[in-house]
Structure formats: structure tokens, C-alpha cells
Amino acid sequence: MCPMRPRRFYFVLLTVYLAACSPSTAERPWADQIAFDRAEKDRSFRERPESPLPPDRKGTFTSLSYFAIDESYRVPASLVVAPEDARAIVKMPTSTGQMRDMVRVGRLAFTLKGQALQLSAFVEAGESRVDRLFVPFSDLTTGRESYAGGRYLDLTRSPSGVYDLDFNRAYHPYCFYNATYDCPYPPPENRLPVAVRAGERLPD
């Protein structure tokens, strides 16, 4: 689960509406599923009470802005897991000036656009279960074509250690839409030296 919080520190579940409303991904081709999930997220932002949009923006909201769906930004990644007794605590600054303690579970190794790259995967300190991994990142679009505070990926823990790293599912944290949310910024180790033109982007 991505660790975005309202300032009153309740947890936010970003993807619950997709799990509840979406049929199995096996029922649709990959690109169609991405398009469907984007439409569902747009609808959630417009209609659901847990939408991060302030009330004065809901009435004019139509859809989020996305890069075109591009399968070249969907790559396999291998997670090199750190031993439990050697997992580092990384202090991440947040959008409200706080510090968040995150545990580095391991590093995802993958190749994107011909470059061998790595991203660290985290869980929030104190989490008793490690069934979802939080992967915040920045890249060469950050602050230009995408939010200056970076973007996030959420991964369901894979027993095999191999992950479907799909940057078409990269999303902006809630603090991009509403300053009352407290969102961690990606650490320096997760700055990618490539432009990831996939997933959510800034409006034109």
C-alpha cells in the first residue's frame, strides 16, 4: 500500500476501487485493461467520497492526464531481497515537511530503453506484513512532464521474485491534487536517468 496520508494520519487505499470494480486482467488484453483501469480511476475521482480532489474541483474535473499506453515501458524486474536483519531504514521527506521511516525490502533490477537500472522497493516501518511493495521514483520527466514530487508504483509481492514492472501504471501521489495529504518524496537512490513517458503526467 502506498503510504499517502491525510494530515490527520489515516491511511489511504488508492487501489481499492479498481480491485472491487475490475474484472480479472485475464479477461482483457493488457492495453485494454490499462485503458479500463484509467477510466475507472477517473470515475472514482469524479464520483467517490474518498476522492482526493477538493470539493471545488470535483465539478469541473473530467479526467487525469496520461502518457500514451506504451508496452516498451512494461518490463520484467528481479527483486534482490535484503535479509530481514539487514534491511535499512530510509527516512523520506514528505510533502508536508515531515519525515517518514520506510524499510528498504530490496532492489528491483531491470532493463529499460537499453539501460540496466535499479529501483529500491519499500514498506512502511512497523508494517507486520510485506505483501505489497511501494516503489516511489523520479525520472527525467519529473518537474517537466510529470509532478515535481515524483510518481509511485505499487507491486503485489511475488513469491518468484520476478515482477511485472509496468510504468504505464505509474501515478501521481494524492498531494499533487490536494495539499492536505502527506506524501513521501522518492529518495535519491530512486532517481532514474531516463525519461519515463508512461503513466500519469502533467496536463498539457
State what each model feature region is.
Residues S22-S24:
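Bacterial signal peptide processing site
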Residues Q33-R107:
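N-terminal secretory signal peptides
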Residues Y181-D204:
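Acidic/polar low-complexity flexible segments
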